Structure formats: structure tokens, C-alpha cells
Amino acid sequence: MFDIEEFLNLDNYATEERVKRRKINTKNNDPSGEFFTPYSIVKHMCDKVSDEDWSDPNKTFLEPSFGHGQFILFILYRRIVEYNIDWCTALSTIFGVELMEDNVAECKQRVHKMLEAIAPDYNKDKANNIMNCNFICHDFFTWNFEEWRPMTEEEIKKAKKK
């Protein structure tokens, strides 16, 4: 069985490279302000969302600085496993902006790994199509949100067929 708490345990992602980069960023007062949220805080914050919002397949979630995906993964997991929303719909309603390109790539890899474990009908190409639209490498404060929108029901159906 897939254990979301273990999967989101930051110790599993404290790679030597990440620790080294974090030390350099801190030492040089890097403006990226990179910080990775522990599972306990992610869960506590997500527990504030109502059951009605979790279960509504039309509700969207926006993570303004998603790092390597702690909130995105928790939201996706909860909507699929606890609220029985199909993986394609759940993923298509999650949006994220991240400044660091390597974090975007890592988040996408982690989403694939989790979906392989929890979604029997998971399709990597479909997931990539959705994530390439919904997970953006950009500065949150300068991104044009007016032109960024959730996929329509028709677009979701088309993505599911591919």
C-alpha cells in the first residue's frame, strides 16, 4: 500500500546536492528563498480545506511556489485516494508556479512516481500533457494569470482519450 506520509517525508529528498545548494543559497543570501515544507505542516494546512471543496471535481488548487511538490502531491493523493476523483481530473485541477527549473522537473517526476503507485489507469503521456500546461517555471509575481485557466471538461475528455 502507498504511504503518502513516507512519500512526502523530506528526509527522503535531502540529497547531498539539495543540501549543498541550500547551504550555498543561505550563505549567499540567495533571493530564491527556497524552503521545503515538511509533511506535518502540509497535512495541517490541507486539513483546513472543507470536505465539500476536496470532493468537488471542479475546484481548482493553486500552489504559488511548489518547490519539489509537497502540496501538489498531497492534494493529488487526497483527491484520488480519499475522495475518489479520477487521477486525470484531479491532476487537471491543480496548478503550480515554481521559479527553479530543477524543482519543476523533480515535482513532475514525483507526480509520475505517485500516480504509478495509486492510479491503475495512469498514463504517463496524459499526465505530461496536463503537467506541461499546469506546472509553470516562472516568477509567480509576474505570471499572467488572466490567460491561464483550468482545462474545460471537453479538454479533459480529450486528454483521457489520448
Whereabouts are the PLM-identified features?
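SAM-dependent methyltransferase catalytic region
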Residues: 1-162
